[in-house]
Amino acid sequence: MKNTAITKQVQEALLPNNVLQDLLEGNNRFVSGSMQTVDNSALVNQTVGGQFPKAVVLSCIDSRVPVETVLDQAIGDIFVARVAGNFENIDILGSLEYSCKVAGSKLVLVLGHESCGAVKAACDGVE
């Protein structure tokens, strides 16, 4: 059971490759239906005074791709920035920079998905 939040000391020791591997393993757990059980009350209590996410994920706003769920991550594990089509703009860039430079996240992951309506709309509008 996941009942311990990431601490600053744990976050500082993480390497980007290990974080990526953890996210991939989380996605494999989601796909196989063997997601970890989580004690949300414990995690809320532990993160009330601060957060030390291991990664920031840029994802589409598509309601069929709830990032924390498809990566099997718990409260405090990751930052998520969502915008239609995973499009980076100045606001999103600021969030990504904050996540890494200020909050200490070790990895930026861009999470795409199939049949993205925003990407299709952008491609259909090309002249």
Pin down the residues of each PLM region.
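Disordered regulatory segments flanking catalytic cores
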Residues: 1-2
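Short, conserved "active-site rim" segments that organize catalytic pockets and cofactor/ligand binding
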Residues: 5-87
